[in-house]
């Protein structure tokens, strides 16, 4: 009888051959650790599925062969990346060149034996840098990205300086503050700038592009309608949708600082200026626009349920019968229903949301429950994840009963605009959505995480 490890090895081989055959037939470069290696392989959906299957099989094979003792050892792998980030090692290594470790240590103001150990650990665990000859360092594809992609550097910094501390204690305790994440960033411009860069990096990951939102919902079936993009930042997704669906008009709403920055940059193509407009609006205040569709992309995962409910209740005075609410956000899978690779990533993101914002990613049932809590007239329609997309789509429709009275939005310091700082996106042009309410992340014991 064939063992599981042999089956996994066969799956790794079979799926890797599919990827390799596609790359060769398409005359695309294969993946390599060399500094000129491709960042994205350009695979078709079918071959992308084979790539993911090969990775998943190899991960399971690795864990089985390592055994249970290895699986419960604390991880120290990221310590080398933290040092590489803090000492900006990558920028000191020439592109298409080489540098002796002893010279690199002098430029980084580091002890040479320590740097040598750190680099060799990073090379073997993360494929960051290469050592073609003893004591000589060159770039790998991964380390070169740290030089040429500032958002990738910001992503590391956010993880090491903010996320790690927050994982251990919660954001507010870790940073000795009673402010929420966004308030804290507002008071620390250098962290806000890095946060913005990190969000830009994360939004470039596989499955996050506007094309997934465009393909994942039947926008063409709406007809000639107006879509309000609440918390839409620079309007990247509204602009993309407007290009694909000429019958739709978009109003992108965000805080005044964001709208002023957008107007100064004027990112809207000339041919779309009559169909994509910007409007100052705080989503914790009453919605002033009566429209056909309200879109929230990647807004709600920053917020605990009670704030999401409050934001949606602010729409009610403007809603007309049949108005749709389209939410593009994470949908946690049921255990063992999706690929292990995807589930690992989304559950890691869920832990980040817990530690940073005292919020969470939500399952389908959570989204349905939130809609019901907002108002019985919010009818949950469906929730799904488009093929290849990192974010799901949640659809609700407003179906009022003539005699029903709308529930009032929660009045609290957190939802008041007085004394509350701008949204994450309002800080140095952050792409992260959400408004800065006074959420004190000081204790995670009482958080309901399903």
Curated annotation (Swiss-Prot):
Domain of life: Eukaryota
Biological processes per GO annotation: methylation; secondary metabolite biosynthetic process
Keyword S-adenosyl-L-methionine in record: yes
GO molecular function, one term: O-methyltransferase activity
Gene3D superfamilies named among the record's database cross-references: Vaccinia Virus protein VP39 (3.40.50.150), Winged helix-like DNA-binding domain superfamily/Winged helix DNA-binding domain (1.10.10.10)
Uppermost EC category: transferase
Entry-linked Pfam families: Methyltransf_2 (PF00891)
Pathway the protein contributes to: Secondary metabolite biosynthesis
Function: Non-reducing polyketide synthase; part of the gene cluster that mediates the biosynthesis of orcinol depsidone grayanic acid (GRA), the only major secondary metabolite known in C.grayi. The first step consists in the ring and depside synthesis by PKS16 leading to 4-O-demethylsphaerophorin, involving different orcinol-like rings, one with acetyl CoA and the other with octanoyl CoA as the starter. Further depsidone formation by the GRA cluster-specific cytochrome P450 leads to 4-O-demethylgrayanic acid.
Name assigned to this protein: Grayanic acid biosynthesis cluster O-methyltransferase
Organism: Cladonia grayi
Source lineage: Eukaryota, Fungi, Dikarya, Ascomycota, Pezizomycotina
């Amino acid at each position: 009888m064939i063992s599981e490890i042999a089956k996994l090895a066969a799956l790794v081989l079979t799926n890797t051959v599919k990827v390799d055959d596609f790359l060769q037939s398409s005359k695309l470069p294969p993946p390599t650790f060399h500094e000129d290696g491709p960042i994205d392989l350009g695979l078709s959906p079918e071959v992308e599925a084979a790539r993911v299957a090969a990775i998943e099989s190899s991960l399971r094979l690795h864990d089985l062969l390592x055994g249970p003792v290895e699986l419960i050892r604390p991880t120290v792998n990221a310590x080398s990346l933290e040092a590489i980030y803090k000492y900006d090692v990558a920028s000191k290594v020439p592109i298409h060149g080489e540098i002796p470790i002893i010279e690199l240590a002098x430029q980084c103001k580091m002890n040479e034996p320590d740097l040598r150990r750190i680099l060799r650990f990073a090379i073997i665990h993360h494929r960051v840098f290469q050592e073609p000859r003893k004591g000589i360092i060159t770039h790998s594809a991964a380390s070169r990205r740290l030089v040429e992609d500032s958002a990738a550097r910001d992503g590391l910094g956010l993880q090491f300086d903010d996320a790690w501390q927050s994982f251990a204690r919660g954001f507010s305790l870790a940073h000795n503050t009673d402010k929420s994440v966004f308030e804290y960033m507002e008071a620390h411009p250098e962290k806000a700038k890095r946060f913005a860069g990190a969000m830009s990096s994360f939004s470039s990951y596989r499955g996050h592009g506007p094309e997934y939102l465009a393909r994942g919902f039947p926008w063409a079936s709406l007809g000639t309608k107006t879509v309000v993009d609440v918390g839409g930042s620079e309007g990247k997704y509204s602009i993309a949708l407007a290009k694909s669906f000429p019958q739709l008009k978009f109003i992108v709403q965000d805080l005044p600082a964001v709208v002023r920055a957008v107007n100064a940059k004027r990112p809207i193509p000339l041919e779309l200026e009559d169909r994509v407009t910007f409007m100052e609006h705080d989503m914790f205040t009453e919605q002033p626009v009566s429209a056909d569709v309200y879109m929230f992309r990647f807004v709600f995962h920053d917020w605990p349920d009670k704030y999401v409910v409050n934001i949606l209740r602010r729409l009610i005075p403007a809603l007309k019968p049949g108005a749709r609410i389209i939410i593009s956000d994470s949908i946690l899978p049921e255990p063992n229903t999706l690929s292990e690779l995807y589930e690992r990533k989304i559950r890691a993101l869920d832990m980040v949301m817990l530690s940073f914002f005292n919020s969470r990613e939500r399952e389908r049932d959570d989204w349905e429950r939130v809609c019901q809590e907002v108002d019985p007239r919010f009818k949950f329609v469906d929730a799904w994840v488009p093929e290849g997309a990192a974010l799901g789509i949640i659809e609700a429709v407003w179906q009022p009963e003539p005699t029903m009275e709308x529930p009032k939005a929660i009045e609290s310091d957190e939802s008041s605009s007085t004394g509350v700082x701008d949204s994450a996106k309002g800080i140095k042009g952050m792409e992260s959505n959400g408004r800065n309410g006074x959420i004190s992340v000081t204790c995670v014991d009482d958080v309901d995480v399903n």
